[in-house]
Amino acid sequence: MLDVNFFDELRIGLATADDIRNWSFGEVKKPETINYRTLKPEKDGLFCEKIFGPTRDWECYCGKYKRVRFKGIICERCGVEVTRAKVRRERMGHIELAAPVTHIWYFKGVPSRLGYLLDLAPKDLEKIIYFAAYVITAVDDEMRHNELSTLEAEMAVERKAIEDQRDADLEARAQKLEADMKELEDEGAKSDVKRKVRDGGEREMRQLRDRAQRELDRLEEIWTTFTKLAPKQLIVDELLYRELQDRYGEYFEGAMGAESIKKLIENFDIDAEAESLRDTIKNGKGQKKLRALKRLKVVAAFQTNRNSPMGMVLDAVPVIPPELRPMVQLDGGRFATSDLNDLYRRVINRNNRLKRLIDLGAPEIIVNNEKRMLQESVDALFDNGRRGRPVTGPGNRPLKSLSDLLKGKQGRFRQNLLGKRVDYSGRSVIVVGPQLKLHQCGLPKLMALELFKPFVMKRLVDLNHAQNIKSAKRMVERQRPQVWDVLEEVIAEHPVLLNRAPTLHRLGIQAFEPQLVEGKAIQLHPLVCEAFNADFDGDQMAVHLPLSAEAQAEARILMLSSNNILSPASGRPLAMPRLDMVTGLYFLTTEIEGDTGEFTPAAKDQPESGVYSSPAEAIMALDRGALSVRAKIRVRLTQLRPPAEIEAERFPDGWNMGDAWTAETTLGRVLFNELLPRGYPFVNKQMHKKVQAAIINDLAERYPMIVVAQTVDKLKDAGFYWATRSGVTVSMADVLVPPEKQEILERYEAEADSIEKQYQRGKLNKDERNEALVKIWQDATEEVGQALRSHYPKDNPIITIVDSGATGNFTQTRTLAGMKGLVTNPKGEFIPRPIKSSFREGLTVLEYFINTHGARKGLADTALRTADSGYLTRRLVDVSQDVIVRETDCETERGITVTLAEKQADGTLVRDQHIETSAYARTLATDAVDAKGNVIVERGHDLGDPAIDALLAAGITEVKVRSVLTCGTGTGVCAMCYGRSMATGKLVDIGEAVGIVAAQSIGEPGTQLTMRTFHQGGVTGGADIVGGLPRVQELFEARIPRNRAPIADVSGRIRLEESDKFYKITIVPDDGGEEVVYDKLSRRQRLKVFKHDDGSERLLTDGDHVEVGQQLLEGSADPHEVLRVQGPREVQIHLVKEVQEVYRAQGVSIHDKHIEVIVRQMLRRVTIIDSGATEFLPGSLTERGEFETENRRVVAEGGEPAAGRPVLMGITKASLATDSWLSAASFQETTRVLTDAAINCRSDKLQGLKENVIIGKLIPAGTGINRYRNIQVQPTEEARAAAYTIPSYEDQYYSPDFGQATGAAVPLDDYGYSDYR
């Protein structure tokens, strides 16, 4: 077998009959499989041992040779080679066909490759192949031309003879008629008798004429057909063909079935055809040119590569190894077999029957019928159901053919090559483990013992607890006490991987150090739940064990959960306190007026109280019950850094540890600040979730990851501790209904009644009534909410939970205690009947019914969304899987401009709200210079929060940053253009698979995006706004948007004309060019609102000035139009902006760079318009890099470069158009991709990840990249010196570790003795 790590590319091509025979180890001649009595394979059958190898190791069929010592001998009795049985997985056989057959992929695929090659319509091809028509394969033009006059004379003679015969017959008949009439005349017969006789005679004469005419016409048809006879001409009429064959058989050759196709291909001159097609493309027009282009693609493929088109017609069919199509005995003596065996048997049966018929010399019609059946059986074997009715097995189930084994989710590619099962793994339910550190997980003892079994057994033998592995295994199975001690030792420092399905992003698998726990559930650290999207309501997780030292190192360094605190999508921490922890910290840092031990200033006779000399003293007071954690106190602090403003005021030279200052705060806040790293400024605020998030963000920017991990761990512990102390619980008594509710509802009820009356009287139409009612009840709900808010006490547990940001929101509180309000129907419109009850009071039957309406829609939506979002992720991964960081810097000068802030009219700067996802974590492309010309931040610097603050302070509003959109690296991207890796906070490493990270970052929040298209309700018939997931798909698939808005092709003034249904907009260009007219723009799409020069916003009106690319109506611009009008850079920025709008609407933060990676892949290709002196075909798609390289080469040689136009491809199309045929085939349309790749003899350079996973190589990303693969360890000087010192002769000198290791034991029979001879 080939070692996969030693080849660089994989080529696919057409196999010729000779190739098939070379692969084969023998011909399969019989359809038999296994002898049902002996259960041994039949000789020459589909499982024959002579062809495919022995069924048992080192044993021939007849049993003459048994044992490994006869290795390689071929038994003279049964002809079976003595070898391992596993050769039955790799040895192929073949079936010699009695008549050639065509390969269905090439004739039936769309477009038909055979049809394009031979220039035959698929319908005609089908007629020829399935014996419904003859085709002329060759014509001897010269011979026909030379002898045409002779043949014509012969034909004239034949015609003359027929005409003479006719004339003579007519003459004779006329005379007979005359004689008959005369006789009747003499007898004095009646006139009607005479008439009958005359009519009869005339009818016969007419028949004579017609018969002769038919014969003459037939001769004429034969003659004209013969004179115009040309190769590839179809003759459907069998009699005509026979006649031609009899008369002019020596001048032409014709046939039907695959044999005729084979002859046509043999006679086909590829070079001449390619030349003539190129000529047609240069000079032709319209349909003719288009067809020539399509045909040239196929013809040129055979012209340039080593493939012969003869491979599309088969003389032999390969038989795959029997172990790949096994036959298994079930209990009860029956057999289960792979469908392929049935399909092969049909082929063999028909083939054998055809051979017999040919030997017998059966009539042609019978032989042809059998050949047609053979063709159909081979078609079914290759691709069942592609043509006609599929071959079915028992129960009318279509049999799975070779193509079906590759296709789809259950096919070879996706089931076995891209998704494999792994050993050393287990799964169990998860429970929370609040006592764990961030990098730990609790592993149940039993599971750990099973996972680490081999390690434990080896260690037991090493420690002499067991004599050999077998007894060690027995000890483990009986769970002896020593086993647990050894397990503790083995498990130490050996990380395990935990994974929760669905793994939507890379944080779905993380490494932890296992801690043994009792019970059978895995314990999970509460802070990693966010990343795994896990909760403890019965979720399960899988455990995997990294075995090799390299795998363990990677798990520990790259995948340990404490090294994965930041989200790869936004670069912000994911391991944040949530739920209980937030509540606990919120409780701890709340300040309550008048609480026990509060600070009171000195009065006349009272000294001041609530002043403490140190936190320790305050804690003593707390322990004695003289102070509450939430009371305001004054305390002298020396170990905590003062806030920035106090530090600036009190310590102008900077604060040092031990400098004292007094804080007016609560003990709780002091305790909270003690959890933060030393030197972090004191935070004197109430900690709701937003503030906690901001602090952890800040920590992640300023401190090393290890400090952040320790801090969040401390916050977790404190959060749980104080949440327990706070006593926050929820009971029915905490749900308070506002007393004013009834009065509010009665007031609005009256308003609603008056609207209803107006509707009854016909003053309002239905839509207006609905709109008015919706408005009334929305106001009512709002007012009940206000009443609720003012009615609740501050310390109410529900309010505490909501205000702290732990979970829930005010709407939910209002639903519980106030009123539910209006709900929507499945269309997304409001039902104008409100739900007036709260859940505390209980809903009426009608209210409950209305409420279920919306709830059920929600559940159905979620299910659909999950599937859609998963498919979107799959397409994104496929399009971007080969984007890997390949070099440090591509040295480009280019970049994109991002806005940092907007200048207001008064000159102040307002920070751009999207700075987090646009400028943050990028590399500067040029120096950022302020108004005076001072460089604030240098080129090549990373923009973190401090750098952005410095730029804003210097008054800089926009900067030019590096971007993957402008990166100059050929395949993949360079580290500088990509910028900081969001997950590590440092410049991205070479080998990082940024494409996959981008796809996951966009796909993972996909489930949160809403499905529905929103309706702008109301009377004015607004267009649908497509939002959520459908909009993201529409953008990435580069589809024309549903409500497409025209964009201005040129800059200029507009003339707006309105009719009752349409707008007509004319743009008068500034440069005086031709006017651009947009006609028939529907008035349902409103005019676009524009920001005008004076800063006001209003609708587009007559006489306004528009810039090129500006949208004229509401709706979405068509990205293809943007590309045409404004070019590739603008369309990329447009797509990024539009995708971000959808995600931002849902409150999801994703960095622009991820979307840019995908968009870059959508614009990788160029359509060739004019090929110049290059090899490209006009109309074909080419990689931009390849296009530019070829053009440089041609220009250097003084030739004409090719002209191309950038194309925007949707992600599905771009995935299928990738250079890697393995990746494309495993994605979608497997047979089409493979057909195309085989014809073009495609070579896969194995540059992406998928291709390498499929063939089992290490992926070229991360530590699998080439530069990291051959690292050698060089000893340091000290180590070298130590190696030459004289060893001391102590006990360990004789230990087995001494000296050169002898390596693993080698089985004797594999050992080569050649060196010793």
From Swiss-Prot:
Residues the record lists as binding Mg(2+): 535, 537, 539
Protein name: DNA-directed RNA polymerase subunit beta'
Enzyme Commission number(s): 2.7.7.6
CDD domains on file: RNAP_beta'_C (cd02655), RNAP_beta'_N (cd01609)
GO BP annotation list: DNA-templated transcription
Region (Disordered): 183-209
Annotated family: Belongs to the RNA polymerase beta' chain family.
